[in-house]
Amino acid sequence: MLFSNMKIRNGRVVALDESKDILYQNIPIHIETDVGEIREHKNGQTTFYVPYGYIKNTKGIDNEEIDCFIGNNPYASNVYIIKLAKADKEEKTFLGFNTKEEAVLCFLAHYSNQDFLGETTELSMQFFKSILYD
């Protein structure tokens, strides 16, 4: 199953119901911020252009569940991980993007300080799934 509990609205992937729990290529994700929603932070606010959440029951380098942005390609064969340059232990995972460039553009659209963009790693979806719960 590629998408479960999701639909395409105005060319964007969105959660179907208020639970905001989805499956993306059988990866369980909780959507914290959906398309069009705004998050406030100390430097202003960010409008989200794609769904953003976390991969359930995982632990990232920050010891919290793995943060992820969900692009519009349910068949994407690669995953992109961007390390935040201003944070030693924070990275964002990009699922559903066709290219590294698309993932980077999505990152830049959601961060007002472009200096946060750090190293980007590309993994095959198959390899990513094999190490996800290690």
Question: Where do the language-model regions lie?
Answer:
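Hydrophobic N-terminal alpha-helices or hydrophobic patches in metabolic proteins across all domains
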Residues: 2-134
